[in-house]
Amino acid sequence: MVLIAGAVLGQRFRGGGRFGRGAGAGDTGITYTEGNVPVDTDKVRTAREIASHSTETSNWTNTPGFERDVFTFVRIMYRHGSYRSGSPWGWITDFPDSDLNLSFRLQQVTSLRTDPDGKVIRLTDPALFDYPWIYMVEPGTLELKEEEVPILRKYLLNGGVLWVDDFWGSVQWDNVESEMKRVLPERQFVDLDMTNQIFHCVFDLKVPMNKLQTPNMRQGIRSLDPSDPYSYGVTWEPYHPGGPETCKDMHVRAIYDDKGRIMAIATHNCDNGDGWEREGEDDGFFHEFSEKRAYPLAVNVIFYLMTH
């Protein structure tokens, strides 16, 4: 995969997105997106089949005969725990817009061909092993079921990679670390600093780590408003369990296999998903967070993981 044109990131989708919030997410039965769109978790298979609650994403097609020779954004449905340690949205946060927007941007600015529909599956779905990359959002309340633990372990040890994103503070970090210890008890997360090649493989991100931090859109807009004495310049979400001091600094952490391949990567104290999902709703948020942070980081992470 090679970079074709970074400049096109400056062309955002436009439309009247909603701040509306639905009834929260479960991993069985009917659940709702943040735009109150019902989703049958037993039937849903793609992001494309669910109505947008932000801005519509362009559709595209791939060369006939090569429809399966593509990168697919695979979102994992999972069970989540107490809302007191995180939001009620769990796995469905930012769905379906973040999945489709990132997929579109990947095929727009690189030579990588992407699935225009995306996938949403459970860890217990046999199709899991058809895809080399999976994504979990808001894993701060993740509760893996007993039958999911050995499946995820097998997936990761056999070449798959997991990206966990959008969780904040010490309490949510502790939960993610604990759940991953169930999967890979012999391994641990290590911090990646800005000298790591993952930050320079496509876009050369020569900035401090916190300059890659993306908050939710509301916080992002407030952080750009000099008339807001409380939030101007605050690109973190200060209200999560563990206290604001544990939410300030962004961390990118990884679990490696014995050959030095990343099996799991965590973007902690960062909401990349909102940067992808909400790109068309506010000019300031788009230019500061989607264009400069969430998209370049995602392109780098996916390129690196798919080529190493």
Language model features by range: what are they?
Residues 3-10:
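Sec/Tat signal peptide C-region and signal peptidase I cleavage site
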Residues 64-69, 126-130, 155-157, 183, ...:
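Extracellular/periplasmic catalytic domains that process cell-envelope and extracellular macromolecules
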Residues 98, 102, 148-151, 172-180, ...:
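Stable alpha-helical elements in mature extracytoplasmic
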Residues 73, 133-174:
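Short alpha-beta junction capping motif
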Residues 14-22, 27, 54, 84-86, ...:
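An acidic, glycine-rich "communication" segment
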Residues 112-122, 164-169, 187-195:
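Surface-exposed patches in mature extracellular/periplasmic domains of secreted proteins
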Residues 78-82, 128, 139-143, 162, ...:
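Solvent-exposed loop/turn segments at secondary-structure junctions
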Residues 10-133, 137-140, 271-272, 277-308:
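Aromatic-Pro/Gly-enriched surface loop or interdomain linker
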